Amino acid sequence: MYDTIKLRYDFKYNNPPPKGVVLSYLDSYTTIDRHHNNTKTETGKLDNLKVSYNNQSIIINGSLCKYHYGENISTLTRQSTKEAIEKLSDTLGFDVGKCDVTRADVSTNVSTTYPPLVYYPYLGHLDRYERNPFKGSLYYKQSTKEIIFYDKVKDAKAKGMEIPTEFKHTKLFRYELRLLKSLNKHLNQIVKAKDLYDETTYTKVGSLWYKTYTDIEKRPNKENIITNMSDTLNAKDLDKALKTQAIKEIGLEELHQQLLALKHRGLINESMYYRKIREYKVLSEVGIQRDDTIDEVNKLIKEVYESLM
């Protein structure tokens, strides 16, 4: 379930690995001298990961999922998290499992009936977060955590990422919980990289991810006659749908009284009066189904959570 992570290998508590060995695996690294605190940081890339080495620590930052799979559309499982951390250790020549985790993005995709943006209006208030729709995504922000819902296929295409065959023709709703800092506080434990694939910690992370989603207010859906119409509405269908919705809301009896008043005032003749009575009666008998759009996502998110337990 992890995507972007930030790891810190602190030399105060761990023996520094040979700098030359670590840097030999990095592409096009650069050196930055900071004279005010007498540090020199050398930074390069290991595949998609950014790796920085200075006289105090090694920092690893980037998508662990993309490092392991070559893309971050697939979900990183507990086992694949272990494999990715071990691969990093073998490559860089030190035990990456001993790194402190200072950031972890917890995420997965669910395949939905509609494009993801259809579901955003049904996700409402969340205490102590600022809700912010932005460029086809929905953000919830606070100082140490961030939630984002977005269209993962659209995001991958925009970044020129290769989309796995099984996802090419799907609508992928992405729910991502970003633990930006204070990770130890959020999980009530010191979190090392090796803990990310520990069963107890992995379950705890999944529980936090799920609880955060369930804490979001789910806005009630209005009864919507348009959901009874065809998937693609032409002008005639739309006109009929809106008329039917209005009749349901005003009430057939009230419409009868209004039509009768118009007839008595001579504004419509008797023929039109009876024709409209029949037309509105037929429309009033069209069944309305409740559009439980967000229930689909609720169910899918719950299924992901239950699969972790």
What are these regions (language model features)?
Residues 1-254, 286-294, 301-309:
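Structured, helix-rich domain cores that form ligand/interaction pockets
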Residues 259-268:
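Short, aromatic/basic-rich helix-turn unit that serves as a nucleic-acid recognition element
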Residues 270-277:
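Helix-turn-helix DNA-binding segment
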Residues 278-285:
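Residue-level detection of the helix-turn-helix DNA-binding "recognition helix"
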